Amino acid sequence: MLWKGQRQSDNIEDQRSGVGRGGLAIGGGIGGIIVLIIALLLGADPRQLLQQNPGVDPNSPQTSRPASTQNDEAKQFVSVVLASTEDVWTTIFAQQGRQYRKPKLVLFSDQTRSACGEASAAVGPFYCPGDEKVYLDLAFFADLKQRFRAPGDFAEAYVIAHEVGHHVQDLLGTMDRADQAQRRLSKGEANQISVRLELQADFLAGVWAHYAQQKGILETGDIEEALGAASAVGDDRLQKAAQGYVVPDSFTHGTSEQRMRWFRKGFSSGDIRQGDTFSTSNVRYLLGAQASLPALDAK
């Protein structure tokens, strides 16, 4: 990805603390493996994974630490990718007669506070609709490369674009409608809604990549890196690696094939009108006529 020298976003909040990585120990055995799966799933739902703590002030000051040169460059990269998503979504929203409200991206180390509660790095990257912020521990990129063998800067860009995709869903009311529907459904049925949300965020990440390519910042192999990352965090692949078999009813993010397919669809079309991941008859039935999700291009 040709990112150096590109515009950087003003919406980065660096809240990295002075505590070294390793505050959360993940032990061996199936329990530790399950925690690892939850920790490294992209787009984890903060309402499910964060410790709810309404008494925490998300705006309270946090101690900063001097970042290493490597982290400085990683921060610049994240800032450039975020700026690119800002440009793309501002344009798309304007075409729909809307105003795009830019999210903040919080860099943290080990632990952080958000409007959704307290979280550790084990949660992985996440979006909190309560404060419209994306939260990211840069150490996750090392996990993506080493544990999941999904290397490359565009694999990292995909992670950011996916979380920003959740912000787009939030602004359009999709997340709220889905949450309302999930509250009245069984766990298995609610998981189906969660999968559709995540696949749509993958599609939206692909839409961003479509316009990033038009800007000339993609290099040969970048899309393959993003597809590799999408495949690496498919529910089926993670469960197979952890326990040797898969349980489809427990999926919350979609299979590797589904995640790659929806990202590829967004990338090839660049058209948000093609991102209706809720169009299956079963999902429509679960949502109900009164809880149907708005189209991405609805005004």
Question: What are these regions, as identified by a protein language model?
Answer:
Residues 111-137:
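Catalytic zinc-binding patch centered on the HExxH motif and its immediate surroundings
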Residues 233-299:
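Pan-zinc metallopeptidase signature
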Residues 1-67:
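Long amphipathic alpha-helical segments used for membrane anchoring, targeting, substrate engagement
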Residues 23-27, 106, 134-137, 167, ...:
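Structural recognition of the beta-strand scaffold that forms the well-ordered cores
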Residues 140-158, 189-195:
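Short pre-active-site segment immediately N-terminal to the catalytic Zn-binding motif
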Residues 164-179, 210-213:
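Catalytic Zn2+-binding segment of zinc metalloproteases
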Residues 37, 89, 136, 155-171, ...:
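Active-site recognition of the HExxH zinc-binding catalytic motif
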Residues 72, 76-100, 189-192, 196-239:
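Short helix/loop segments within enzyme catalytic domains
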